[in-house]
Design a protein with these regions (language model features):
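Conserved PDZ fold ligand-binding element
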Residues: 86-87, 285-316
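Short, solvent-exposed beta-edge and connector elements
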Residues: 65-67, 273, 286-292
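Serine-dependent protease modules
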Residues: 2-270, 276-279, 297, 316-320, ...
Length: 353
């Protein structure tokens, strides 16, 4: 017969036997594997440079007229400089009236927008902190990446701060569309898990150096599906100093306005049609012509750009990509189609908005 002390025990339970005690821990190997140690070291060093970004919009209640802060979204970023510059995606802070940055030590700081480049989905913020509080992210390169290299992503997916995922470089030289519908070239594809909230965070190589800014995913559900994209660090390292200095990307250009690609396609023209030439600009000084009205009241098309420095251009995106390969003050040869005649014209590039 069961005693009162046994009342309530599951049938057959024996709390005094070995089965009723915590199991002993199986001894581990003396050391972690080399790959594990490397991953841990990289994470512990790099995570200090990763930040959480939350933005809000200011709205006024139509009935009470009270002003409210409404959460807009969140994402990731990383410390660029000891002066408090933070790099993230433009789409992370788009439409924000107020931006808050949380550092790895949990301290919160209001941030101001220093500069943005929607065409490359990049933005630079700045926070005010005391000296020695910030650890800038180590910078690597993307031109020498190889498919199969190990990569690490650190960010705040779904608000879960300082989450680490790992994978490999799945492909190189991809193209994606930015918010402004411009094509971003040379994008790094990875299978490291990228989820909502990872945007703006760093993609690192096995040495813990920045090789890209996590930006987009391809997924039917909107969550991780094994295909993520990062803006290459070589692009980031070229653009961010411009954003810090000028607040925007200062591009070399021809000083022209262009006819939309759709119209050129409709007219069966392969190239970029000049709509208007800025007076005194590079194209004007080189003798390029925009669309103009004839004495009979008819519209005569402007010159058609077909190549820049030997690189063929068939769309406005092509032209802008060709411009990005040059600097302000460069001398380039532009090939145009004027009527039925092809001409090569030397042009000196100048800064344009």
């Amino acid at each position: 017969m069961a005693s009162a002390a046994d009342w309530g025990k599951p049938l057959g339970a024996n709390h005094d036997g070995p089965e009723g005690r915590p199991r002993s821990v199986t001894p581990a190997s003396p050391e972690l594997g080399a790959d594990e140690r490397t991953t841990i070291t990289v994470f512990e060093r790099a995570t200090k440079s990763v930040v959480f970004i939350a933005n809000t919009a200011i709205q006024q209640d139509i009935w009470s007229l009270n002003v409210m802060e409404v959460p807009q979204g969140s994402g990731s970023g990383f410390i660029w400089s000891k002066q408090g510059h933070i790099v993230t995606n433009f789409h992370v802070i788009y439409g924000a009236d107020a931006i808050k940055v949380t550092l790895a030590d949990r301290s919160e700081h209001q941030a101001k927008l220093v500069g943005a480049d929607p065409d490359h989905d990049l933005a630079v913020l700045q926070i005010q902190v005391s000296d020695g509080q910030l650890d800038p992210m180590a910078i690597g390169s993307s031109h020498d990446l190889r498919v199969g290299q190990k990569v690490l992503a650190i960010g705040n997916p779904f608000g879960l701060d300082h989450t680490l995922t790992t994978g490999v470089v799945s492909a190189l030289g991809r193209t994606i569309k930015s918010m402004s519908n411009r094509t971003i070239e040379g994008v790094v594809q990875t299978d490291a898990a990228i989820n909502p909230g990872n945007s703006g965070g760093p993609l690192l190589d096995s040495a813990g150096r920045l090789i890209g800014v996590n930006t987009q995913i391809v997924s039917p559900s909107g969550a991780y599906a094994g295909i993520g994209f990062a803006v290459p660090v070589d692009t980031v390292n070229r653009i961010v100093p411009e954003l810090i200095k000028h607040g925007k990307l200062i591009r070399p250009g021809l000083g022209v306005s262009l006819v939309p690609d759709a119209m050129a396609k409709r007219w069966g023209i392969k190239g970029v049609i000049i709509g208007k030439v800025t007076r005194g600009g590079p194209a004007d000084r080189a003798g390029l012509k925009g669309a103009r009205e004839t004495m009979l009241g008819q519209i005569q098309l402007g010159d058609v750009l077909v190549s820049v420095a030997g690189k063929a251009v068939t769309t406005i995106d092509d032209l802008m990509d060709a411009m990005e390969e040059h600097k302000i003050g460069d001398h380039v040869t532009v090939e145009i189609l004027r009527g039925n005649r092809r001409e090569k014209v030397p042009v000196t590039l100048q800064a344009v908005n």
